[in-house]
Swiss-Prot record:
This is ATP synthase protein 8. Pfam families: Fun_ATP-synt_8 (PF05933). One of its GO terms (molecular function) is proton transmembrane transporter activity. It comes from Pichia angusta (Yeast). Signal peptide: none annotated.
C-alpha cells in the first residue's frame, strides 16, 4: 500500500490538491454558469 509509505505523502497531497483545484475551476467556470443560464431561461419561459 503506497499510501502508508511516507515518501508518497507529498506526491499524493500535491495531486490531490491539483485535482480539487481542477474540479473547482470546472465547476465555477463551466457548470455553474450553465445552471444559472438554464434557471434564467426557465424563469423567462414561465413568465410568457
Amino acid at each position: 500500500m503506497p499510501q502508508l509509505i511516507p515518501f508518497f505523502f507529498l506526491n499524493q497531497l500535491f495531486y490531490g490538491y491539483l485535482a480539487l483545484f481542477a474540479l473547482l475551476v470546472l465547476v465555477s467556470w463551466v457548470i455553474l454558469p450553465y445552471l444559472l443560464q438554464l434557471q434564467i431561461v426557465r424563469l423567462l419561459i414561465t413568465k410568457l
